[in-house]
Amino acid sequence: MILVDWQIMDRISRGQIKVEPFEPGLIQPNSLDIRLGDHFVWYVPGDRVIDPYDKESVTAEVEEMNANEVILYPGQFMLAETKEVLSLPDNVVASIEGKSSIARLGIELHQTGGWIDAGFIGSITLEMCNVNQRPVKMYAGMPIGQLVFYTTERAEQPYNLKQDAKYQGQRQATLSRYHENQRFIQ
């Protein structure tokens, strides 16, 4: 079941869903708007291959900054963070969606990582890309996306109890930690 405005507010007021900082005006009929944080990470353009199983190649030739505004250039991929830190109970999951007004500028908010598991605690890393033909300026604190909350049965092992919860507790834009996964290919 998707939570509606009063259910979102009720769960936040009772501490079942935690959002810091919380702004009641960001609650929408079926979602909670989230804002852009001020930490940004991107890969320096080049020919170096990124191997997801090799931590050094994942973390090499990366730039990052904290700023109140950032320009995303055509074709550029950038990681960012949400201003909000989220804490989900073991029976609520969330999905992140872009705001239509931002999408109409050519900004994709997430590539495929739009699912937030029950038990997750942390800021959300955004995988942004500009598919417009023109640069787009964005500001820390601007509403950029929305979280849709779903109730589920209680997870037997929520994300916060998993031994391999790679992104639990993250507080800034976080590079891929795929290299920490067990390797299944031959």
Curated annotation (Swiss-Prot):
<dbReference type="GO" id="GO:0006229">
    <property type="term" value="P:dUTP biosynthetic process"/>
</dbReference>
<feature type="binding site">
    <location>
        <position position="159"/>
    </location>
    <ligand>
        <name>dCTP</name>
    </ligand>
</feature>
<dbReference type="Pfam" id="PF22769">
    <property type="entry name" value="DCD"/>
</dbReference>
<keyword id="KW-0547">Nucleotide-binding</keyword>
<comment type="subunit">
    <text>Homotrimer.</text>
</comment>
<comment type="pathway">
    <text>Pyrimidine metabolism; dUMP biosynthesis; dUMP from dCTP: step 1/1.</text>
</comment>
<feature type="binding site">
    <location>
        <begin position="99"/>
        <end position="104"/>
    </location>
    <ligand>
        <name>dCTP</name>
    </ligand>
</feature>
<dbReference type="InterPro" id="IPR036157">
    <property type="entry name" value="dUTPase-like_sf"/>
</dbReference>
<feature type="binding site">
    <location>
        <position position="166"/>
    </location>
    <ligand>
        <name>dCTP</name>
    </ligand>
</feature>
<dbReference type="GO" id="GO:0033973">
    <property type="term" value="F:dCTP deaminase (dUMP-forming) activity"/>
</dbReference>
<feature type="binding site">
    <location>
        <position position="146"/>
    </location>
    <ligand>
        <name>dCTP</name>
    </ligand>
</feature>
<feature type="binding site">
    <location>
        <position position="117"/>
    </location>
    <ligand>
        <name>dCTP</name>
    </ligand>
</feature>
<feature type="binding site">
    <location>
        <position position="170"/>
    </location>
    <ligand>
        <name>dCTP</name>
    </ligand>
</feature>
<feature type="binding site">
    <location>
        <begin position="125"/>
        <end position="127"/>
    </location>
    <ligand>
        <name>dCTP</name>
    </ligand>
</feature>
<dbReference type="GO" id="GO:0006226">
    <property type="term" value="P:dUMP biosynthetic process"/>
</dbReference>
<keyword id="KW-0546">Nucleotide metabolism</keyword>
<comment type="function">
    <text>Bifunctional enzyme that catalyzes both the deamination of dCTP to dUTP and the hydrolysis of dUTP to dUMP without releasing the toxic dUTP intermediate.</text>
</comment>
<dbReference type="InterPro" id="IPR033704">
    <property type="entry name" value="dUTPase_trimeric"/>
</dbReference>
<feature type="site" description="Important for bifunctional activity">
    <location>
        <begin position="114"/>
        <end position="115"/>
    </location>
</feature>
<dbReference type="InterPro" id="IPR011962">
    <property type="entry name" value="dCTP_deaminase"/>
</dbReference>
<comment type="similarity">
    <text>Belongs to the dCTP deaminase family.</text>
</comment>
<protein>
    <recommendedName>
        <fullName>dCTP deaminase, dUMP-forming</fullName>
        <ecNumber>3.5.4.30</ecNumber>
    </recommendedName>
</protein>
<dbReference type="GO" id="GO:0000166">
    <property type="term" value="F:nucleotide binding"/>
</dbReference>
<feature type="active site" description="Proton donor/acceptor">
    <location>
        <position position="127"/>
    </location>
</feature>
<keyword id="KW-0378">Hydrolase</keyword>
<dbReference type="GO" id="GO:0008829">
    <property type="term" value="F:dCTP deaminase activity"/>
</dbReference>
